[in-house]
Amino acid sequence: KKYLMICSALLAFPAMAQDTYENARLLGNDLNGTARYVGMGGAMEALGADLSTIRTNPAGIGLFRKSGVNFSLGVVSQANANAKLDHSATKLSFDQIGFYRTMRTGQTSYVNFAFNFSKGTNFNYFLAAADHLNNASLGKQAYLKGMRGSLSNGGYSIGTGSGSNVDTYYGYIDNSSNNIARNYGQLDYLYWNTRLVDKNTPSLFGYDAANGYDFNRSQRGYIGNYDFNISGNVNDRVYLGLTLGLRTVNYKGYSEYVENLVNASNTAIGTATITDERKVKGTGFDLSAGVIFRPVEESPFRIGLSINSPSWYDLKTENYTTIQNDGQNQGKWEHGKSSEVY
């Protein structure tokens, strides 16, 4: 058997699209927190007196008059989970735990300290899909991009490397450039160096179409929010708060994609299998401040205002992608591997 392996961190493979895709996982937050907060749909920025407002409006912690502890559990359930990827249908989720400490500073004034852990995003998820393909394939897509000849035409120019990479195919900006085209990614590399180049005649390019596919993806992990708060009130009318938030990111995903290959007569000739394992780890932080004002002393009516900074992250992404060439019209290699770290 012949094998192909590359560590693309050593090459100029573009990671912009993948980087944007991975960062999109960090956007937004799940509705997690105390039972009261979740039951109210998170609309408690002006009400306060709930640990989960520690991020949305830190002044809400200033309404507490007694110290306390709070924790919440949740259940993540997804039907038709796939045992093949070791993904169970139901998982217990520890969503929130925290405490608050109150200190009286006057007859109607307090200074409070609080800490709260919550899951900002729960990544536990499974997806399975299968359908027909009308003579399309990922190999066909990579082939057509190579035939366009340049980045300006929506593709790239296929050529070999130099030195120890003289037998390796790359997609360049055009036929006069030594720079890798930004649309030449890991899958393009794997296909051009496993399936699209004839093993006996390297100058002959070709692809196999497919009439169906099977796709499975399993992902796990979460974004952990660790929030530290100081807050208080002035004469039980004005409530102020400040929160420092620390974030931890722990994501792991695995996907498997299988195409059923066919020849020009629509006869099955094997499969092409792509697997991808991806990890994202890192830390981040943000700041938030808030105020709640009770304009009428005899009324519980309150007005809340808060400001939240963006979250700054320092992330490390690793991925490992393979292709298994099990078609009859095998190309140059039977198996390919590619990894990236950024």
Regions found by a protein language model. Name each.
Residues 18-32, 37-38, 95, 102-342:
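Outer-membrane beta-barrel porins/channels
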Residues 39-52, 83-86, 213-219:
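Asp/Glu-centered strand-loop micro-motifs enriched in Gly/Pro and often flanked by an aromatic residue
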Residues 49-103:
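Long, well-ordered hydrophobic secondary-structure segments characteristic of membrane-embedded
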